[in-house]
Swiss-Prot record:
Record protein name field: Energy-coupling factor transporter ATP-binding protein EcfA1
Chain positions recorded as ATP binding sites: 44-51
Domain called ABC transporter: residue spans: 6-245
One MF term in the entry's GO annotations: ATPase-coupled transmembrane transporter activity
Short name of any one Pfam family annotated for the protein: ABC_tran
EC number: 7.-.-.-
Record key words, sorted: ATP-binding, Cell membrane, Membrane, Nucleotide-binding, Translocase, Transport
SUPFAM superfamilies named in the record: P-loop containing nucleoside triphosphate hydrolases (SSF52540)
Subunit: Forms a stable energy-coupling factor (ECF) transporter complex composed of 2 membrane-embedded substrate-binding proteins (S component), 2 ATP-binding proteins (A component) and 2 transmembrane proteins (T component).
First-listed, main subcellular location of the protein, grouped into a coarse class: membrane
Length: 281
């Protein structure tokens, strides 16, 4: 039996248009559970509501209707907001917007200091967080001299130092080059596998979703699909219809099947494709 980390119950979020003539519904009746220790990916094209939903998971936004519960605490209860944010950290798209100090270790210490953690414990938390993301040797560096991937790992360390049980990554690799993206994705997977932190990854990079425990697909504010990566991605037709890609090898399998070549339709990686083609010899 899994413990529930996050529960979204019929969540609706509306905001006024610029002319204030009517409301726009960004999240429309979303019900979703995230289990403790799970690696969940939320996919959707721009405007699908995925980032708006993400901001509900640590009470940056509260629902217009419905409820979001984080480890039993209702995000609409103002008295619980700081507790919720200490349980559920968030890493945003642009690391420059999340880094507040001029030295790496001072930046990582900022969160625990604001939580009132004792100085001796802050030192330990900062060192452990930087080691967890492979940035300990850069602790005395100035953040602006780091690469994009390194900055994002410092931002992750800043969240880790607050000892969250869950981290939401809101398109945190979108502004990175391929090397930086790989660094951050490897860090995310390591935190989930070895530190057992619940991960909620919002992305539009399909390759990042392959290793998830579960994928949720959003379109027009609604959850339209949910399942393990193989289940979700093999439905290439539906994914294309809503403007999303699938992993390259899944698409290749789809095209081969259309040409009458009998390969599996749930292939995700190059190795799987090679093995499948060798089987057909």
């Amino acid at each position: 039996m899994y413990n529930k980390m996050v529960e979204c119950k019929n969540v609706v979020y509306q905001y006024k248009n610029e002319d204030e003539s009517k409301n726009t519904t960004a999240v429309n009746d979303v019900t979703l559970e995230v289990n403790e220790g799970e690696f969940l990916v939320i996919l959707g094209r721009n405007g699908s509501g995925k980032s708006t939903l993400a901001k509900h998971l640590n009470a940056l936004l509260v629902p217009t209707d419905g409820k979001v519960i984080v480890e039993g605490l209702d995000t609409s209860n103002e008295e619980d907001v700081w507790t919720i944010r200490s349980k559920t950290g968030m890493v945003f798209q642009n690391p420059d917007n999340q880094i507040v100090a001029t030295i790496v270790e001072e930046d990582v210490a900022f969160g625990p200091e604001n939580l009132g953690v004792k100085p001796s414990e802050i030192r330990e938390r900062v060192d452990n967080a930087l080691k967890s993301v492979g940035m300990y040797e850069y602790r005395k560096h100035e953040p602006h001299l780091l690469s994009g991937g390194q900055k994002q790992r410092v931002a992750i360390a800043g969240v880790l130092a607050m000892h969250p049980k869950c981290i939401v990554f809101d398109e945190s690799t979108a502004m990175l080059d391929p090397k930086g993206r790989e660094e951050v994705v490897n860090t995310i997977m390591d935190l989930n596998k070895n530190s057992h932190i619940t991960i909620i990854l919002i992305t539009h990079y399909m390759e990042e979703a392959i290793n998830a425990d579960r994928i949720v697909v959003m379109d027009k504010g609604k959850v339209i699909k949910s399942g393990v990566p193989r289940e979700v991605f093999k439905d290439v037709k539906t994914m294309k219809e809503i403007g999303l890609d699938v992993p390259q090898m899944t698409e290749l399998a789809y095209e081969l099947k259309k040409e009458g070549i009998n390969v599996k339709d749930d292939i995700l990686t190059i190795d799987e494709m090679v093995n499948e083609l060798c089987r057909l010899k």
